């Protein structure tokens, strides 16, 4: 079945119109800026939309806005819209129908909206015709499947576009083919590809991506080769003789002692020429005589398929015997040479086609661009696209890269038509060549796999053309095919002072080291171990990245400049050597050194590398850009090493430097290996390198096993320190109590001496100061008592009445005990009298707060009478009063004592007899303890009250009251 010639032209024109309308319009607008879109044919189709703005938390957020624009634009041939903030909109009295409101954003200069839009003639992805190649774009987060109305889907190519991100294009053809080929319908979602296939986390790629697809709906009975369909479009072949000469030159340069085999191949080719002529006579007249010599040679290769399959079987059979017979190396060399020469022939055909295509494009554009530059751009782009032969991809690429629409003095429509026709014919031929190369390559690899263990010396893995055929620095970040067209990077190497400058560390980076001080020993050791692991791992990655940059730089020079087989290891060593020489000597000519090296390598080859001006400029850019990135990586290493050294010094201060023994030795060795460049076989940075220090935690486990007892001792020491501190505090408290008791005993034993000393003026001055302190302390105690009284409004009155009754009962009981004490210790009467006066002063102050003024005056008169007539009785009363006042002070200072007294008062109302008996026993116990001058009551009361501070204050008050009484006497 054949498609008529005029129908083919109509379909081609329709497809060309589709390509013209399938341009994508990329926009970056600010909030408030109006964006106006219009389609001359078809309707608007929003591919993606992302809002990047500052939110209320001062954070940059990324939000998809496809739905907002689609509501206004999809299905219309023109659209006007702008974005604004929600708060500003609420202040407007009338709403603008073209506005899109974003509620999460606040005003900022960083806010912007990124969109990509195209035009579609159809509103669905239903493909009506079979055997017609459709090209269209698919939006981000697509939910509409591609459907073949007649036939099954056959994906020719698929590209993932990210126009606002660092990597703008990614080839996803294989993934889409596996998913969609031979199906009636298929859903292609760019958002799903980014998240699930590529595991992308960057919001730029997730929100700002779309897919371009080339699809054909095929039936079970397919039409023949596409190259026959395109044979109707003629392109004059004026350089056919030159191509034949190039082919012969390439074949002769790669024979390598295989003349006999080549002669056989030539005989076979001559036989096949006859077959080709017979086959061509059976074709239609429309397909006769339209192709040049290049096309005829391609047809020869196509008709040689059966012969090649036969030879491949021979190779397989022979290699099976060769594996067991090592003496037949020459035969392997012949087979290898034969396959290599065939691949070189196809590569020569491909180069000739690119040269011819570049010449035609240069003529179409009135020689605005040199044909070599166009050819170089096409070859680089072809390799970047992984040798995809889809002509539509290169049509769009050339229209954009060469700015064809801006060229003057040309008929734009004719140029577009001719450009598309030339690309379609040439790329179809190149696709056929690529398939033949793939066949030869598979046979070559099969041969290599069968002899690589027995005869590995026959294949050079560093420079083999076939084994390294697919090696290309994809997404290298240093260079791209449109260099000097879409962007013009600097060709100058970075400043020497900046190059030798070390990376500096910031205070924030040192904060992790300074945060170790407040930790205890165990946590500090654990934290230092964790930080050491993190820093060493980060340094390992940085060293690998640095060495990989040298490798990427060498690979880019080979693929974009030299474009011939080249040993990357030797070039990488040379680049590293020149880098360190340049750091030592700023006048060192790095570019000349690389050019000389490539010329020396090229001296033994017949196919020379082309030292065109564009090639040399690309070489300079690669050297400058590569060294710049390497220097930045070195500064990162310097910063990490500074943090590592600071952590090591901190560990030394805590005697934990043993944790760094293994990592220190490793990093020293790593730095030496990373900077070595004398031996090409010792280039460091291979991805296959293994480092035991990171693969296991043996070092940390050993270090932890070396000091488990030390950690236990540290923990025990910490506990002992805490206990010793508490014991010291208790000792200090007991010593303070002992000193207070000693002062009391001395005052009791020597009252007369204290009285004599108090007659001096100095003592009077000191006593005046003590009086002031007593007054302030009494005021504080009164305020505390007032607060306690406020908290106990209902119970204090009853408590005071009971306390008064208890005081009277206690006085009667203490009088009897005091009489016996007078007989035993007559010397202590004076001290007791002093204590009595002190207690009376306190009683007066307290009675004034508790009783009315009349009761207080009566008690004072009774006290004076008792002091005049019964001196002995008053001394006994003072002792009891002291004990009672102590209990009262403690009860007033502590809520617990007051609560106990209140509970006692409440219980006394129920049973007065039991209360009085309990109080008598309590007073008697206190009297016995005071007579023996024992300090245990003070300690027990202190522990019961739970505070040593108030106990010390009460003792201090007693001493001060003694001094006041002495002064009064």
UniProtKB/Swiss-Prot annotation:
It is found in: Cell membrane. It is a lipid-anchor; GPI-anchor. The keyword Phosphoprotein does not apply. Residues 312-325, 713-727, 897-907 have a biased composition (Low complexity). A lipid is attached at residue 945 (GPI-anchor amidated asparagine). Residues 946-969 form a propeptide. Keywords: Cell membrane, Glycoprotein, GPI-anchor, Lipoprotein, Membrane, Signal. Residues 229-241, 688-705, 937-947 have a biased composition (Polar residues). Residues 1-22 form the signal peptide. Its main location: membrane. Residues 300-311, 728-749, 812-822, 842-854, 883-896, 908-917 have a biased composition (Basic and acidic residues). Coiled coil: none annotated. Residues 798-811, 823-841, 855-864, 918-936 have a biased composition (Acidic residues). Membrane receptor which tethers secreted RH5 to the merozoite membrane during merozoite invasion of host erythocytes. Forms a complex composed of RH5, P113 and human BSG/basigin; the complex bridges the merozoite and host erythrocyte membranes. Within the complex, interacts with RH5 (via N-terminus); the interaction tethers RH5 to the merozoite membrane. This is Surface protein P113. It comes from Plasmodium falciparum (isolate 3D7).
